[in-house]
Amino acid sequence: MGRVRTKTVKKSSRQVIEKYYSRMTLDFHTNKKILEEVAIIPSKRLRNKIAGFSTHLMKRIQKGPVRGISLKLQEEERERRMDFVPDESAIKTDEIKVDKETLEMLASLGMSDTLGISAVDPQQAMAPIPAFGGGRAPRRY
């Protein structure tokens, strides 16, 4: 069973990663040396804990965005995803096939002249649903 990390370790790791992300690596010993240079940490034990959690977070960042850490690269990627507009809509409304009853309802609402609506036979629109068991013979017990 793992150990519980204190709030101090988590907060300081996140701050160090946000400020010095370009210098941090996936190696514990390298991160420990970087922490020694950039931060004033009162004890060796605390420094090791922060370096260990920083290494853990760096590995998680490699897989995807991590909650609580705001990196420039992740911000830009998120904005690109939000601004993306597909070339072709996933919902195609060129032709909408409806049955006779639905056409009558649209006519009563005054929307019968809407473009792209075509009538379809109910038998043609509804495909037969296969019976449970795939249509094979019943079991013999």
From Swiss-Prot:
Return the GO cellular component terms, semicolon-separated.
cytosolic small ribosomal subunit; mitochondrion; nucleolus
Q: Name one Pfam family in it.
A: Ribosomal_S17e
PROSITE patterns xrefs: RIBOSOMAL_S17E
Q: Which GO terms describe its biological process?
A: translation
What is a GO molecular function of this protein? Answer: structural constituent of ribosome
Lineage, top-rank taxon, reads: Eukaryota
Q: Which Cys-Cys disulfides exist here?
A: none
InterPro entries in UniProt: Ribosomal_eS17, Ribosomal_eS17_CS, Ribosomal_eS17_sf
Write the signal peptide boundaries: none
Q: Give the similarity note.
A: Belongs to the eukaryotic ribosomal protein eS17 family.
What name is this protein filed under? Small ribosomal subunit protein eS17z
Organism expressing this protein natively: Arabidopsis thaliana
What gene does the UniProt entry assign to this protein? RPS17A
